[in-house]
Amino acid sequence: MTKKKYLMSSAQMTIIAAVQEEAVVQGSRILRSAFIVVASVIYLVAPSAHAQVQNNAGGAGQSPRTPWGDPDLQGLWNNATITPLQRPESLGDKAFLTAEEAAAMEQRAAEGFSQANTPREVRTEPLPVGGDVGAYNSFWTEEGTAVVQTGRTSLISDPPNGQLPQLTAEAEARIASPAYRRLADVRDGRVPADGPEEMGLSERCLWYRGIGHISPTGYNNNYHFFQTPDALVILQEHIHDVRYIFLDGRPHLPSSIRQFAGDSRGRWDGETLVVETTNVREPFIRRWNLPQHSLGRGDLSDQVLLVERFTRTGPDTLNYEFTVNDPNTWTKPWTGSLPMARTDGPMFEFACHEGNHGLMNIMAGSRAEDAR
């Protein structure tokens, strides 16, 4: 089918990209980021064509189709799950759970969430000055309640043992360095930050991910997919990150141009959209996106290549597979699989924005302490 330009009726899709520059401020290198509008892409879709997007279920063995004939990935998808990234050692070589084991795991998770919601104490008097008032309970989180639909014991499918590959000697040295350990300690709350330079971009409400990897978090696990003949746009609920993936065959950016989420290019391989992401900015992912947060133990380098595969496997399911290849970090590539489920939404605003008051108030409180 010949591809044509279609427009989404009465809608304008504004694409936001993140660029960053390095600046030298009093001898310290800091990352400054600015969100700029790089494009406003408008496509017209006649009402009948829009209805076709919703109703065209495709032929036998085919996923739903867009008016221009590509598999239709559009919609609001959720990937919350209690399945861990790595297989628990207690499961050995067991790759899949039985139905009974999956039900038992989900029951244990439900009991854990219920217990976490139980008040630890009921206070009638204020705490002494400096007392711990606690934090969010599981009412405020959305970690998922079920194992992945495939019943896998881990999101990692390769290596077959469900574990991350061995780190290279170079990676071991990186994560053992004092600078790395310092940032990890600040991130994990073991020590306070010395200044704003040690606060991550997610705490500034600027950016959450260092690469395009879609993995479940503690909450806000929704992703809104928008699709045109030439692009796929993914709006992530968490810190409202936006990925713009070109599908028009253009080459990757020159290796000298590095971006927060790297540079993504997509192509169709039958029913599957294959996306390759390169050009990740190494200082960013090291300082502000230490990968234990989403990828397990390790430290990505600027040589990382991320290959993602999106496949509609049913009216309400989208399979997401990813392969991480970083020869400077792991001794071999590794692959994970994460089925996503359609959700009706709506996806609410993530009310976190650049220039919010959190960091300013933290700094003001710290300076007040210094002045005592």
Regions found by a protein language model. Give the residues of each.
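Bacterial N-terminal signal peptides
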Residues: 12-14, 34-46
